[in-house]
Design a protein with these regions (language model features):
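Cofactor-pocket helix-loop regions in the catalytic cores of large enzyme subunits
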Residues: 547
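N-terminal localization/anchoring segments of enzymes in phospholipid and broader phosphate metabolism
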Residues: 1-542, 560-564, 574-600, 604-610
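Hydrophobic alpha/beta core scaffold segments
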Residues: 567-571
Length: 610
């Protein structure tokens, strides 16, 4: 294959995947600094930024950590960096962004003060505040704590992932270091009290750090910090575990237990630890000193999701939030619109756009299919389900009514594994057939097939979408869901489910583009048509909206199209490894990223000519 980028450093046109993701997360962080966004929504964006960063370190840095051990010389195909180089670049980038997060938190605290809400600084307390804090520590916190001494007689404890600790260096009689560690995950992250019509927020970590000396009696503290551990969460399942005689659900349960004890990939401190403490912890936790990151603001920012409800339980402060937006029900099948779902779909395709539309029409369709005598089976691929899922309940109801219900449930949906294990049990007990996908691929498709027998002929209702079958996230993500009785779509969906039941991937389709065999070749084919259109004097146009772009073959094809004169517009929310507007290569490529109230999640491809 002719090289598309022969005479230019690849780093000028391609971006490292991990650093591109960090730029995306920086865009999330920037929303928390936007004064036009309501206060509590800004706090939520800041919490999302830190939550994203936690997951990034657990998964992506965790994966690079593994690669640095197993394949230390493997290079990134876009920038030529090995795993160790990428980790160094990530840590440097994290340190560069940290002051921006600090500024965002300070701006939110300032606005909270303007709203008569104070984040207490324990170094500057009034006498009354001091009395309240002292009482809270003595009566509410101290009885629940279990301080631990770490020395030659007391072994180093296991430090759980994403949990914070007070770590203190205690005065020692010899040169050996003596530590005091106080776990406090069992305590609430903050305490709120009222004084003189002002609300005061007190962070548990700050209180414990302030009173640390009281926890260790006569042993004098030489230095003290809040510390937080991040562990690798990039578990992989060996394909041998899919053997016929293996209980894959049980294997995944054991893998989740293993995840909790994987290697440490990040150590966060509230202040700079001394050299002796750093060296001791790095040795015990087997991490490099460059994995120590400092943050003067709260290390665990998960409190930001719950704090708005604690401060305003009835949402009386309308100015603190985005205006309320309720999903619209375009067709209320349950109330007889269109003569019911199945009747309506005989004459109309239905395109739902979330979060603007409700998931109700799809749930109504499943419930109606459960009771319709013409329906033979319901087959569906499930990735992430909501708690108390109406969709799962509808599938269980259909099985209980005697329908054949096949659920392809992906147990490896990251951080939803346990939820999916629980749903697998529930669906099986209702009578559904549950299979767990393929050894080499995650089943990420959002596909549902309802098969009917009408006048001795097989007819299909097919739903294909970009979003999970999850009523909760459908109100937070922009997604598309297309429902049709198109026979070709139904036949393709049948092939997909038949292949999955055989442990295979579908290798040919007529209407649906199904990865890994049918999707990328079709994208390449249609871009090639636009290239040929331009070369024959016509105008070529490509529009792509996706979550991420990092596939080298597609990026090189887009560069080739740009060089041919094809106008290319892309909306890419997250990772984007292609630089637009590089002279001679991507001149005709324009890329935007949308970050806002809703998480952009729909995928759209438009090929205009050719």
């Amino acid at each position: 294959m002719q090289e598309i980028v022969p005479n230019i450093s690849r780093s000028k046109i391609f971006v490292n995947r991990e650093l591109s993701w960090m730029e995306f997360n920086l865009r999330v962080l920037s929303e928390s600094l936007n004064p036009k966004i309501p206060l509590m929504e800004r706090l939520k964006f800041l919490s999302i930024y830190f939550s994203n960063l936690d997951e990034f370190f657990m998964v992506r840095v965790g994966s690079l950590h593994d690669q640095s051990i197993v394949e230390p010389d493997k290079l990134d195909d876009k920038t030529g960096l090995n795993a160790a180089d990428q980790i160094d670049a990530i840590l440097n980038k994290a340190n560069q962004i940290n002051p921006i997060a600090q500024k965002a938190w300070e701006s939110i605290c300032l606005e909270l003060r303007n709203q008569d809400i104070d984040i207490l600084d324990l170094h500057h307390l009034s006498k009354l505040d001091e009395q309240i804090v002292q009482k809270y520590f003595s009566e509410e916190m101290r009885p629940l704590l279990s301080p631990q001494i770490i020395d030659r007689q007391h072994p180093f404890p296991f430090l759980k992932n994403k949990e914070s600790f007070i770590v203190s260096v205690l005065e020692s009689k010899d040169e050996n270091i003596c530590l005091g560690i106080v776990p406090f995950s069992q305590l609430p992250p903050y305490f709120i009290f009222n004084i003189n019509q002002r609300r005061k927020i007190l962070f548990t970590a700050d209180v414990l750090l302030h009173f640390a000396q009281k926890l260790f009696g006569k042993q004098k503290i030489q230095e003290k910090h809040v510390m937080r551990v991040t562990r690798n969460a990039d578990i992989s399942v060996d394909e041998g575990l899919f053997d016929f005689d293996i209980d894959f659900r049980g294997v995944m349960t054991e893998m989740l237990k293993k995840r909790r004890r994987l290697d440490v990939v990040r150590l966060q401190f509230s202040s700079q630890p001394g050299e002796k403490l750093s060296a001791f912890l790095c040795k015990k936790l087997k991490v490099s000193p460059n994995c120590i990151l400092l943050r003067s603001i709260p290390l665990d920012f998960s409190f930001g999701f719950a704090l708005p409800s604690a401060l305003d339980p009835h949402k009386d402060k309308k100015q603190w939030y985005y205006h309320e937006a309720k999903p619209f029900v375009p067709v209320d099948f349950a109330n007889g619109d269109g003569g019911g779902a199945i009747n309506y779909l005989q004459n109309h395709d239905l395109l739902l756009s979330f979060p603007f539309h409700s998931t109700k029409p799809f749930v109504d369709l499943l419930n109606e299919a459960a009771d319709d005598p013409s329906v033979l089976s319901i087959k569906i691929s499930l990735y992430r389900l909501a708690n108390h899922s109406k969709i799962a309940s509808a599938l269980a109801h259909a099985a209980e009514k005697g329908k054949e219900v096949l659920c392809v449930l992906e147990l490896r949906a990251r951080f939803d594994e346990q939820n999916n294990i629980n749903y697998a049990t529930m669906l099986e007990e209702a009578g559904c057939t549950v299979i767990y996908g393929l050894s080499d691929y995650k089943i990420h498709a959002k596909l549902c097939l309802i098969t009917r027998k009408v006048h001795n002929q097989i007819r299909y209702i097919t739903q294909v979408g970009t979003g999970n079958y999850n009523e909760k996230t459908s109100e937070l993500y922009t997604d598309l869901s297309f429902i049709s009785t198109d026979q070709a779509m139904g036949e393709d969906a049948t092939r997909v489910f038949q292949a999955l039941c055989m442990g295979e991937v579908v290798d040919s389709t007529k209407s649906l583009w199904v990865a890994p065999n049918c999707f990328e070749p079709n994208v390449i084919k249609y871009i090639d048509e636009q290239i040929e259109a331009c070369r024959s004097g016509k105008e070529g146009y490509v529009f792509i909206k996706v979550n991420s772009l990092n596939d080298m073959e597609i990026m090189e094809k887009l560069i080739e199209a740009s060089q041919a004169g094809v106008k290319i517009e892309m909306v890419i929310r997250g990772i984007c490894c292609l630089c637009p507007g590089v002279e001679g290569y991507s001149d005709n490529i324009r890329i935007k990223s949308i970050v806002g109230r809703y998480l952009e999640h729909s995928r759209i491809f438009i090929f205009a000519n050719g």
